[in-house]
Amino acid sequence: MLEALLLGVVEGLTEFLPISSTAHLMLIGDMLGFEGPPGKTYEIVVQLGAILAVCVVFRQRLWGVATTITQPRSFAFARNVMVAFLPAAVIGATLYKYIKQMLESPLVAAIALVVGGVAILVIERLVKRARIHDIEDMSPALALGVGFCQVLAMVPGVSRAGATIMGSMLLGLDRRAAAEFSFFLAIPTMCGASAYSLYKNWATLSFDGAGLIALGFVAAFLSALVVVKGFIGFVGRHGFAPFAWYRIAFGSLMAVLILMR
């Protein structure tokens, strides 16, 4: 029970921060021996818990877009999210086997954590003035650019949130808009990834310990709820440097532990 609760909390806390939930789940899951088909079922379900948190926090905005989709700004919002989703959908489905092989390499994740941390520090220094303050004001080409940045997150340890937020900032979005776009882009991306993973692993999935899986879902939902509500305010005050230094420290520790085996 403690293992399921811990991994659910880790998923919820790390999924929407630029620190790679995959790397954290990989290391902690390996330490706890939480692997195999039941582990895959658990991984898929807890991701859905994290997605639900975004939908709950931004429910009014999502509902507003859905009910006014024919209006120009609502249409632009939905268009930009879906355009940004396309590269990951197409490339992810095409390269699924290779991505799965990479996901089995904790050392790759550790190196990506460190490299990504350094990249965040560099980008924070490079980006001085944003020119886009709302998702609706993005062009389709810019949204597509963010989508290709998201593809980088297929390498474990890169972080989907980190790649999309930093990519958005490099392309002209301010911190708040970049963070929000990353949240909204997570909805189709994570739902699509979960659905594709279900399809590919259906024959080996197991719902043994359904109670523990449900516990992980709830833990991921509640912890993600806290993160999503507080993240934008935090980066507005402190920027992304704290996450960069954490990545470098955690990635280095992860690499040392792996090499000491």
Swiss-Prot record:
TM regions (residue ranges): 1-21, 38-58, 75-95, 103-123, 138-158, 178-198, 212-232, 240-260
Any one Gene Ontology cellular component term annotated for this protein: plasma membrane
Pfam families cross-referenced by the UniProt entry: BacA
Gene Ontology terms describing biological process: cell wall organization; peptidoglycan biosynthetic process; regulation of cell shape; response to antibiotic
The family this protein is said to belong to: Belongs to the UppP family.
PANTHER family: UNDECAPRENYL-DIPHOSPHATASE (PTHR30622:SF3)
Designated name of the protein: Undecaprenyl-diphosphatase 2
Organism field: Paramagnetospirillum magneticum (strain ATCC 700264 / AMB-1) (Magnetospirillum magneticum)
Organism phylogeny: Bacteria, Pseudomonadati, Pseudomonadota, Alphaproteobacteria, Rhodospirillales
